[in-house]
Amino acid sequence: MKVSIITSCFNRAATIRDAIESVLAQDYNDIEFIVVDGASTDGSLEIIREYEGRISTIISEPDHGMYEAINKGIRVATGDVIGLLHSDDFFYDNGVISRIVEHMKTTRADFLYGDGLFVNPDNTDKVVRNWIGGDYRLWKVRHGWLPLHPTCYIRREVMMRLGLYNESYKIAADSELLVRYLMTGGLSVTYLKEYVVRMRMGGLSTDSAKRKKMLSLIHI
């Protein structure tokens, strides 16, 4: 099972190396790593290019935001399963992808999610919030629960069939996609009771007030 990991980046020179290194350190061999840079001006692209030959695909061109960049990555991906690692984040350890693949093979799931840690951006050893996904129930989605987006791994054919990220949402396109997939996709969903990712606090995607405002605009 090939896993495509997509990282979008714009002016993240301070953190992009951690993200890249955590992908390259994975002990699973069949990984396609795609980095989509939005024409960064802070040295991010120069850091990314240090890893040419180890990153499967590097795209650098202006875009209209993170979700357009992610969609570009998905369209060129060739993996059986697609996951995201944001440029501020890094994997929990080097066995994450191996455990994801094993669990998806065992359960034959279309969609997997796991647990995550929110960490202090200045001291990533300091955990700010421990996010535990818990067992999947559709009624939980109907009542506003969603899996933690950076822990989600989805079969590529599902994404091609159900559609990619809605680029008109500048903050919560990930939430719109998850609601759409889980509510209308008829998917086999599984929960991996393992930590997948460490997320630095402070980005738009971790601002709960802004996300709640955007979620109120989502219509399925």
Give the residues covered by each predicted segment:
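Active-site-adjacent helix/loop segment of glycosyltransferases
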Residues: 215
